[in-house]
Design a protein with these regions (language model features):
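Predominantly soluble domains enriched in secretory-pathway, periplasmic, or organellar proteins
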Residues: 1-288
């Protein structure tokens, strides 16, 4: 399927009929590419201006949510109206990846060059003391910025929502945040230098970290916070996708043009899929 000249991340709609692709351009492009997965054809692109550099991408609550790295922002696109319907600035450098809770009330982002994680919360603000007598509460968004390591990019929130793990590419450290307390709780010297993506397994018991620099896949036990396995994926491990049924993980090897399949019980590479050049972002498309 034809997309833009610099596709990075991909996501499918909840009904599995439409895919969205961010066309990144190092923060300078302004396009979401759209694909009809049923007819297998490209649909008209979405112009994200004034938001530039769309990268991280999720589909939640009927909308496509994305980071806009070049504009230090996040935004959302509503397929029902065909419009960009919301945006919020982070003020952080290289707002790159994001996670949106199922109710779309909280958004997490990694800000790579700032070395921070943003927690954006949809909040009901109560009237202040100087407000008129008939003033009503109003909705607004608040931001909590948590310092982590420089180069923190890949991250994930545990299935139960109790932990956020992110890995810093520069020093290979893993930072663990309590989302409820909005505080850094722990650091792990994971030695995952070049960390690119991080994903919890569907049961929440392991964390997978890919290294684009070394081609390794680091597997950590969540309870003990210890490395339990390390697999050589190829010359550069990138995107990670978990099978929702908990049986497999798919890991893109960008430098080798294949996607490795890892069995989640044995934690062994069982197969690989030869794909096009420089695979990176991966997504499930599930149709009822």
């Amino acid at each position: 399927m034809p997309v833009g000249v610099d596709p990075h991340e991909v996501i499918a709609s909840a009904d599995g009929k439409t895919a969205y692709v961010t066309n990144y351009g190092g923060g300078s492009y302004h396009e979401l590419n759209v694909i009809d997965l049923v007819a297998q054809k490209a649909l008209p692109d979405i112009d994200t201006r004034p938001l530039f550099g769309p990268h991280g991408l999720v589909f939640v609550n009927g909308k496509a949510w994305f980071t806009a790295e070049g504009s230090k922002s996040v935004g959302s696109y509503d397929p029902a109206s065909g419009k960009l319907d919301w945006s919020l600035g982070t003020g952080q450098d290289r707002t790159h990846m994001l996670f949106v809770t199922a109710d779309a009330k909280k958004i997490y982002t990694t800000n790579v060059s700032s070395g921070t994680v943003s927690i954006l919360t949809d909040t009901l603000i109560q009237p202040g003391r100087m407000a008129p007598p008939n003033a009503k509460p109003r909705k607004d968004w608040t931001q909590t910025v948590i310092p982590v390591g420089k180069g923190s990019e890949g991250f994930d929130v545990s299935p139960d929502g109790s932990q956020l793990w992110t890995a810093a590419s520069e020093d290979g450290m893993v930072y663990i945040i309590d989302p409820a307390a909005k505080m850094l709780k722990a650091k792990i010297d994971a030695k995952a230098v070049g960390a690119n993506r991080l994903k919890f397994t569907p049961n929440g018991k392991q964390v997978f970290i890919s290294s684009l620099r070394t081609g390794d896949l680091f597997i950590f036990d969540v309870a003990s916070r210890k490395e339990i396995r390390r697999l050589k994926i190829g010359r550069g491990a990138a995107g990670i996708l978990m099978d929702p049924d908990g049986s497999r993980a798919f890991v893109a090897s960008s430098a080798d043009n294949f996607v490795a399949i890892v069995d989640l019980k044995s934690l062994e590479i069982t197969n690989r899929l030869d794909v096009g050049p420089v695979p990176d972002g991966l997504a499930w498309a599930i149709r009822p």
